Curated annotation (Swiss-Prot):
InterPro entries in alphabetical order: Cyt_b/b6_C, Cyt_b/b6_C_sf, Cyt_b/b6_N, Cytb/b6-like_sf, Cytochrome_b, Cytochrome_b_C_euk/bac, Cytochrome_b_N_euk/bac, Di-haem_cyt_TM
Subunit-structure text: The cytochrome bc1 complex contains 11 subunits: 3 respiratory subunits (MT-CYB, CYC1 and UQCRFS1), 2 core proteins (UQCRC1 and UQCRC2) and 6 low-molecular weight proteins (UQCRH/QCR6, UQCRB/QCR7, UQCRQ/QCR8, UQCR10/QCR9, UQCR11/QCR10 and a cleavage product of UQCRFS1). This cytochrome bc1 complex then forms a dimer.
Function: Component of the ubiquinol-cytochrome c reductase complex (complex III or cytochrome b-c1 complex) that is part of the mitochondrial respiratory chain. The b-c1 complex mediates electron transfer from ubiquinol to cytochrome c. Contributes to the generation of a proton gradient across the mitochondrial membrane that is then used for ATP synthesis.
Keyword vocabulary terms for this entry: Electron transport, Heme, Iron, Membrane, Metal-binding, Mitochondrion, Mitochondrion inner membrane, Respiratory chain, Transmembrane, Transmembrane helix, Transport, Ubiquinone
Protein name, UniProt field: Cytochrome b
Gene name linked to the record: MT-CYB
Binding site for heme b b562: H83, H182
Presence of the UniProt keyword Mitochondrion in the record: yes
Length: 379
């Protein structure tokens, strides 16, 4: 008799994706983040569902309903902080996952990479809309500033912004539709994740050497299930430490004041995971230019496979490219720091230099390093 997991139509899919999947024998812990992202998504959907049972998407009651969740709902505060800090863990895993892809040349699996970039956009949009829902000061002003950027689009900009707002300012209609989309998007993301995995399983996983590993594969279970559980434990412990000891560490104190359209906070800034893009946006004095730079800072990931000049796939044996990669990481950390600082000297010039360097490394320095390494190896 055939094993049910190999014959049942549904079990067969799970078996071929998580149990009998042939995986390279040498993939490191950097390959853990895919499964961690899946768990993050499940956690966000679950905590979000329970929060939505108590939340009201009306400007008069939204802030109070969040307060009610924290004070009166059984373990409501745990749900709320798991959801808020879960988003931070999601982005930490997301950025490390993308960094792994860049370092080891995983972007050469074009379909998987492109679906991943679209996923990144979808997750960022979802997180932004979620930040608006508590209807605190930073929620309101963040929504106003970021949606208002669309008015920079020539000819249709103003109409587009008013259409998104559902009126002439961020108001009740905006909050209601943001809640609707924030609830819907994670399910769309889940469907896209399946596409991401489908494309990945067409080619199989990359590995740290960047060399095809067809001749040396091992089953995913038990080897990588155990390895993923270790990563999961580390992530869950970190998340619980954050939630139970300093739940507000990554939030903004301004968001504990109810939204007031008549009072602008001194420093409007998004959550930490958007600060690098926000710094790039602010570094350009022109509105349209800033918006284009903001979009391109993420969209540039799409063209990375086209900028691959090296004859080796991975950076494991390419010291020059490694230097460029870590310079890019340092630059992104600098941009994140700048994004949280006020717009004044010397932060303005540092932000502008870091923004130029960001685009320069990706479009010029990394491809040049690849070409130079080819020459040094006489390839």
């Amino acid at each position: 008799m055939t094993n049910i997991r190999k014959s049942h139509p549904l079990m067969k899919i799970i078996n071929n994706s998580l149990i009998d999947l042939p995986a390279p024998s040498n993939i490191s812990s950097w390959w853990n983040f895919g499964s961690l992202l899946g768990i993050c998504l499940a956690l966000q959907i679950l905590t979000g569902l329970f929060l939505a049972m108590h939340y009201t998407s009306d400007t008069t009651t939204a802030f109070s309903s969040v307060t009610h969740i924290c004070r009166d709902v059984n373990y409501g505060w745990v749900l709320r902080y798991l959801h808020a800090n879960g988003a931070s863990m999601f982005f930490i895993c997301l950025y490390l996952h993308i960094g792994r892809g860049l370092y080891y040349g995983s972007y050469l699996y074009m379909e998987t990479w492109n679906v991943g970039v679209i996923l990144l956009f979808a997750v960022m949009a979802t997180a932004f809309m979620g930040y608006v829902l508590p209807w605190g000061q930073m929620s309101f002003w963040g929504a106003t500033v970021i949606t208002n950027l669309l008015s920079a689009i020539p000819y249709v900009g103003t109409n587009l912004v008013e259409w998104i707002w559902g009126g002439f300012s961020v108001d009740k209609a905006t909050l209601t539709r943001f809640f609707a989309f924030h609830f819907l998007f994670p399910f769309i993301i889940s469907a896209m994740v399946m596409g991401h995995l489908l494309f990945l399983h067409e080619t199989g996983s990359n590995n740290p050497t960047g060399i095809p590993s067809n001749m040396d594969m091992i089953p995913f279970h038990p080897y990588y299930t155990i390895k993923d559980i270790l990563g999961l434990l580390v992530m869950i412990m970190s998340l619980l430490a954050l939630v139970l000891f300093s739940p507000d560490m990554l939030g903004d104190p301004d968001n504990y004041s109810p939204a007031n359209p008549l009072n602008t906070p001194p420093h409007i800034k998004p959550e930490w995971y958007f600060l690098f893009a926000y710094a790039i946006l602010r570094s350009i004095p022109n509105k349209l230019g800033g918006v284009l730079a903001l979009v391109l800072s993420i969209l540039i990931l799409i063209i990375i496979p086209l900028l691959h000049t090296s004859k080796q796939r991975s950076m494991t044996f390419r010291p020059l490219s490694q230097c460029m990669f870590w310079l890019l990481v340092a630059d992104l950390l600098a941009l994140t720091w700048i994004g949280g600082q006020p717009v004044e000297h010397p932060y303005i010039i540092i932000g502008q230099l870091a923004s130029i360097l960001y685009f320069l490394i990706i479009t010029t320095l990394m491809p040049l390093a690849g070409l130079l390494e080819n020459r040094l190896l006489k390839w």
